[in-house]
């Protein structure tokens, strides 16, 4: 399946472009054994013209036939190539980026390839319950591997100390697995799912404006 790239996508997001769009499908909690609970998930990756992807994942518990039973969770965050930010980049806060992006050509992006011919990436993901994760990892073609570098927990949050996530595009479907270290346990299977693309990515020009 060809990857549709919005015409206004900033060059440094091209390695991540296969994630763009809306994805939906079924998953299983834990190891996926017979007693593991089922869930439905809707994931959206979008771009607003800046050098990161916005990420939202909504999940619902379901019965074995896929009928939604009740909301399960929501998480959201930002994904980007991992590089040192400079004067052309926006932030912190509301400091605007330059009109001309830091990386303007495919050659600029190619210089960021790592020793495995992929790209280093970072993702920040926030959960309900006072938990925020900072991931570092790599993307190589349609495969992503992420590991937490830091987990921030609020005073009342449950124990959650580390996580890994893997994503892959297989025959047009998005496969993912999430392992976590929580409640005093070491890393173990937490959830996995297979999602199908249900909506193509929008360009920044198509997104609603005030």
From Swiss-Prot:
InterPro entries: Calycin (IPR012674), Nb(III)_bact/plant (IPR022939), Nitrobindin (IPR045165), THAP4-like_heme-bd (IPR014878). It catalyses: peroxynitrite = nitrate. Pfam families: THAP4_heme-bd (PF08768). It is an enzyme of class 5 (isomerase). Its EC number is 5.99.-.-. CDD domains: lipocalin_heme-bd-THAP4-like. Its cofactor is heme b. Keywords: Heme, Iron, Isomerase, Metal-binding. Pathway: Nitrogen metabolism. SUPFAM superfamilies: Lipocalins. A motif (GXWXGXG) lies at residues 21-27. Heme b binds at residue 190. One of its GO terms (molecular function) is heme binding. Homodimer. Belongs to the nitrobindin family. Heme-binding protein able to scavenge peroxynitrite and to protect free L-tyrosine against peroxynitrite-mediated nitration, by acting as a peroxynitrite isomerase that converts peroxynitrite to nitrate. Therefore, this protein likely plays a role in peroxynitrite sensing and in the detoxification of reactive nitrogen and oxygen species (RNS and ROS, respectively). Is able to bind nitric oxide (NO) in vitro, but may act as a sensor of peroxynitrite levels in vivo. This is Peroxynitrite isomerase. It comes from Renibacterium salmoninarum (strain ATCC 33209 / DSM 20767 / JCM 11484 / NBRC 15589 / NCIMB 2235).
């Amino acid at each position: 399946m060809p990857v549709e790239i919005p015409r206004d996508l900033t060059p440094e997001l091209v390695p991540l472009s296969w994630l763009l769009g809306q994805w939906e499908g079924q998953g299983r909690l834990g190891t996926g054994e017979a007693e593991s609970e089922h869930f439905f998930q809707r994931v959206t990756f979008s771009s607003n013209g800046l050098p990161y992807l916005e990420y939202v994942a909504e999940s619902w518990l379901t019965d074995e036939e896929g009928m939604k039973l009740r909301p399960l969770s929501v998480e959201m965050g930002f994904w980007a190539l991992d590089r040192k930010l400079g004067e052309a980049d926006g932030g912190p806060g509301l400091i605007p980026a330059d009109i001309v992006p830091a990386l303007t050509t495919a050659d600029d992006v190619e210089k960021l390839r790592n020793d495995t011919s992929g790209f280093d990436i970072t993702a920040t993901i926030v959960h309900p319950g006072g938990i925020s994760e900072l991931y570092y990892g790599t993307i190589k073609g349609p495969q992503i591997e992420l590991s937490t570098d830091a987990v921030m927990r609020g005073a009342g949050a449950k124990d959650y100390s580390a996580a890994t996530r893997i994503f892959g595009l297989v025959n047009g479907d998005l496969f993912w697995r999430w392992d976590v270290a929580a409640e005093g346990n070491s890393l173990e299977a937490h959830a996995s799912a297979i999602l199908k693309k249900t909506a193509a990515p929008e360009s920044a020009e198509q997104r609603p404006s005030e």
